[in-house]
Each structure stands twice: as structure tokens, then as C-alpha cells.
Regions:
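Flavin (primarily FAD) binding-site architecture
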Residues: 214-229
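A conserved short coil-to-beta-strand element within the FAD-binding core of flavoproteins
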Residues: 179-193
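Glycine-rich FAD pyrophosphate-binding loop
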Residues: 34-55
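C-terminal catalytic lobe of FAD-dependent flavoproteins
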Residues: 153, 159-162, 169, 228-277, ...
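Glycine-rich Rossmann-fold phosphate-binding loop(s) that bind the pyrophosphate
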Residues: 21-23, 45
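Dinucleotide-binding Rossmann-like beta1-alpha1 core, especially the glycine-rich loop
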Residues: 58-139
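Core beta-strand elements of the Rossmann-like FAD/NAD(P) dinucleotide-binding domain
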Residues: 13-15, 202-211
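Extreme N-terminal leader/targeting segments of oxidoreductases
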Residues: 1-17, 32-36
Length: 509
């Protein structure tokens, strides 16, 4: 099976834009630019969504707590984006109700009501319901002392798949997407950038471009200093956010937003039917962003917040898995990590006649599409042929010809009556209408190939290698699917062996 776009562009080809970074902002900009007719080359040193973009709380949300920091522009933009992304990717984005237990000594009821009133009215709502007050009865999962609360709507998203789908959209508009490709350095030569990149096999090439976008996330400032030999216009603050995954903590498909004594909030979110996701933390991080991991202090912090609210008391032994990431936020000199702005800053540098450099500082998953539109507005003076904005009305791959995941699931089971319902459900919520590409030519279970485990078959692995840049076990089990939580060590070994053979076959071909 060939890797998509691994060697599709000749050496020293000239592009309009080279994008550094395969996180949500990089692929969002690549897709937007390619759809406007620009010729785009994106390189990512690891896998798509390998770092910050797969370590989020997996929410598309307005950011209720940002209202306390008066970030009205960010909240308004984020609220509006919820409905846009629901329509763009109905297979991986879903509405979710959030329950906020009232703790009067932390925030008075009038303050929460005022915040929710703004939340309801600042963004256009079509599918998302309004907020309301709640009273908790005897059957509540919360402690008896917590009798009142509030409920409002936001959305959940599969964060890593949002990145992959944007990369696919970019490719379908002509962009060249190269994973496992490190940028060794770049320099301005006349009116162009010359960018040297190194592929996974060690081979190097030079790519020329009229513009360079630095969307390196946690490495954005480091890239400017070390690889471009320039001065970074802003400092970056790395704020670590860690999460726990525990067995399902309560019944229902709603999330909880818990207020802690330190004025921070922590989410408890239903995850993959069997689990509850708990997070996040906020702590300054000064190490290598690639090596971030949850600390004992963070683990205790999250357990304590949850145990202060729920009847069911969690212990360390209940933790099924953890993950951590760093948010690369623009340094606004705030003393409190929680108060550092989540808004984005775009820094354009281009003296007269120079090829432009656009660097992305900060940003959040929810507003990636608006960030990309803003990036295009910054670059417009350098690309007179650039088309207009288009991403608000377009679906992401898999969102085409789709009403709901449930309807797609039913169509899958009607056409393939032998298919296990759990697999049909997972495929509908993972691939959307692209599941028909995955199943092209499949008449019966024998056509799915080798059974690897947890509902994963060779056919799906081949699809992910061919269409979604997946090369490793981790790419497949943790980012393209979430089957890492459901597979045994033996099943993971089976997958590793299958991938090894598949790689050998593709090299032989």
C-alpha cells in the first residue's frame, strides 16, 4: 500500500506556501489555502496531531470560563464555530449537555446566570439548546450537599480525527502533505523561501515557496530562532494540561463542569461509552514538549476535585489511562497559568519585497477554522490570485451526504447484514460517509482480511495507511481510532507484525 503523498512532489518544486506543522492550525491553514487555489506543501516531523492537537479535552466549546477573563471576542467566535463544525463534520462532532453543580461559596448564582445568559445569546444557536437551572434529587451522582446546578450546551469532538480530516481536505484540494518529514531550516533567497526538509528515510530535499507559515505549535518560537535564525516577535508559554481516563463514573451522556476551590474548573466527560475523561490541569511547563507526562501532583489534583463532588470516590487504582499535552500560548505576562489568554496571535514579517513569514502563536481547537481564515487575510496581499473564504459552508471528508451517524449506521447494517453493530457504530462515528470507500469491494466478512482484535481488521488498517498517513501502531490505535484503550498486548503485537509486513510489501513494490 502506498503512502499518500510521500514522494509526490519533485525536488526544488516551487509552491505558493510551505506550512510547518501538522497540528490543527497547520492543517487548517493548508486546507483553507489549497481550497483558494494556492499550491501548498505541508511538513510534519512526526504524525498528524501527534502532540498538542491530540491531547485536548476534546471539546468544541465557547469557553464559559473565558468570560471571567473578559475574553468576549474569543467566546463569541468560539460559540459561533460550534454550529459551523457540527455541520462540517457530523460524524466526529456531537452536541453535549454540560451540568455545572452550584457551589455558592465559589461563585454566586447571579454570576453564573449572567454568564450563561451571555453564552446563550452571544453565539448563533440552531441545534444547541439554551441553558437552564437544575435541582438534583435523591438519585443524583453528586454528593447530597450539592442540590442545585445549571445546564448548558457545547460540543464534543474527536480531536485527532479533526486534524486528519483537515489534512485530507487539503490533499483533495491539491496540497502535498508530508508526515515524518522534518524541516531542517529555511532561508529567504530573493523573493522566495528555500526550505530544506528531511524525510523518514534520511533523504533531504529543498522546497521553494513564495510564503512560509510557521504552525509548529509548542516549537513555534524555537523554530524561528533555531531554524530561521531570526528573532521571535512573541514569547511562548507552555502550559501543561493533563487528563485521567477512568471507568464510567456516572450514568448519562452529559458532561460535568466542576468548580474547584482554586477558582479553576475541571470537566468530567463521557468517553467511548465505557469511560469518563477527567481534565484538565494548568501548570507551567519548561521541558521538551515531546516528553510531557502527567505528574503525581496533577493526578491528586484531579482526583480531589472529582471526589469533592461525586458520591463514588475515585482512587489511583481506578485510573485506566492518562495523557498530557502542552498548550503553546502567547505570553501575555499573566501570573496565573489559567488566566493566560487562549486567543491566537498571528505574526507576519515581510520587509518590502521579502517573502512573507506568518507565525501562529496560541489558538484553540474550536477556533482553528477562523484562525486559518485570519491567516489567509494576512497573506492575501502576497497572493493576488487567492480565492475567497470557503470553509464555513463546506463539509470535511466523511461529512458529505450524511445526516446523522445513526442513519449511516443503519444504512451500513442494511447493506452489510453480517456486520457487527458495534463495528458499524464505530465506523460511522469515525469515517462518516468515507466508510463506503473503506468497504469498496467488500461482500462479506472474509473480505475484511486478518482479524487483529477489538473489531480492527486488515481492511481498515490498509485504508488508514493508504488514505490517512498512518504508519505506526500508535498512529492507528491512538489517533486514527481510539482502539488503544480496548486492545490487548497480544493484539497490539499482531498489529505491529501486520504493519511490518505491509511496509515491506510497499517497499518491494
Amino acid at each position: 500500500v502506498s503512502q499518500p503523498d510521500s514522494t509526490s512532489a519533485p525536488v526544488a518544486d516551487c509552491y505558493d506556501l510551505v506550512v510547518i506543522g501538522g497540528g490543527i492550525n497547520g492543517v487548517g491553514i493548508a486546507a483553507d489555502a489549497a481550497g483558494r487555489g494556492l499550491k501548498v506543501f505541508l511538513c510534519e516531523k512526526d504524525d498528524l496531531a501527534r502532540h498538542t492537537s491530540s491531547a485536548s479535552s476534546k471539546l468544541i466549546h465557547g469557553g464559559l470560563r473565558y468570560l471571567e477573563h473578559y475574553e468576549f471576542r474569543l467566546v463569541r467566535e468560539a460559540l459561533a464555530e460550534r454550529e459551523v463544525l457540527l455541520a462540517k463534520a457530523p460524524h466526529i462532532v456531537k452536541p453535549m449537555r454540560f451540568v455545572l453543580p452550584h457551589r455558592p461559596h465559589l461563585r454566586p448564582a447571579w454570576m453564573i446566570r449572567a454568564g450563561l445568559f451571555l453564552y446563550d445569546h452571544m453565539g448563533k444557536r440552531k441545534r444547541l439548546g439554551a441553558s437552564r437551572s437544575l435541582r438534583f434529587g435523591a438519585g443524583s451522582a453528586l454528593k447530597p450537599a450539592i442540590t442545585r446546578g445549571f445546564e448548558y450546551a457545547d460540543c464534543w469532538v474527536d480531536d485527532a480525527r479533526l486534524v486528519v480530516l483537515n489534512a485530507m481536505a487539503a490533499r483533495e484540494h491539491g496540497a502535498h502533505i508530508h508526515t515524518q518529514t522534518l524541516c531542517l531550516g529555511a532561508k529567504r533567497v530573493g523573493a522566495l523561501w528555500e526550505v530544506e526538509v528531511q524525510h523518514a528515510d534520511g533523504s533531504t530535499r529543498t522546497v521553494r515557496a513564495k510564503g512560509l507559515v510557521n504552525a509548529a505549535g509548542p516549537w513555534v518560537a524555537q523554530f524561528i530562532k533555531n531554524d530561521l535564525k531570526l528573532d521571535a516577535p512573541y514569547g511562548i508559554r507552555l502550559i501543561q494540561g493533563s487528563h485521567l481516563i477512568v471507568p464510567r463514573l456516572y450514568e448519562g451522556e452529559h458532561a460535568y463542569i466542576l468548580q474547584n476551590e482554586d477558582q479553576r474548573i475541571v470537566f468530567c466527560i463521557p468517553y467511548l461509552d465505557r469511560f469518563t475523561l477527567i481534565g484538565t490541569t494548568d501548570r507551567e511547563y519548561t521541558g521538551d514538549p515531546a516528553k510531557v507526562a502527567i505528574t503525581d501532583q496533577e493526578t491528586d489534583y484531579l482526583l480531589n476535585v472529582v471526589n469533592a463532588h461525586f458520591n463514588h470516590q475515585l482512587q489511583r487504582s481506578d485510573i485506566f489511562s492518562t495523557y498530557a499535552g502542552v498548550r503553546p500560548l502567547c505570553n501575555d505576562e499573566s501570573d496565573n497559568p489559567s488566566a493566560v489568554t487562549r486567543d491566537y496571535t498571528l505574526a507576519l514579517s515581510a520587509a518590502h519585497g521579502e517573502a512573507p513569514l506568518l507565525s501562529v502563536f496560541g489558538g484553540k481547537l474550536t477556533t482553528y477554522r477562523k484562525l486559518a481564515e485570519s491567516a489567509m487575510a494576512e497573506l492575501k496581499p502576497f497572493f493576488s490570485q487567492m480565492g475567497g473564504s470557503w470553509t464555513a459552508e463546506s463539509t470535511l471528508p466523511g461529512g458529505e451526504d450524511m445526516t446523522t451517524p445513526q442513519a449511516l449506521e443503519e444504512a451500513l447494517l442494511a447493506r452489510h447484514t453480517w456486520l457487527a453493530p458495534a463495528i458499524a457504530q464505530r465506523w460511522a462515528r469515525t469515517y462518516g460517509s468515507r466508510v463506503w470507500t473503506l468497504l469498496a469491494g467488500v461482500e462479506g466478512p472474509q473480505d475484511l482480511g486478518q482479524a487483529i482484535g477489538a473489531g480492527l481488521f486488515a481492511r481498515e488498517v490498509d485504508y488508514l495507511r493508504e488514505h490517512e498517513w498512518a504508519t505506526s501502531l500508535e498512529d492507528i490505535l491512538w489517533r486514527r481510532t481510539k482502539l488503544g484503550l480496548f486492545t490487548t498486548e497480544a493484539e497490539q503485537n499482531t498489529l505491529s507484525q501486520y504493519l511490518e509486513k505491509a511496509t515491506q510489501r510497499s517497499h518491494a513494490a
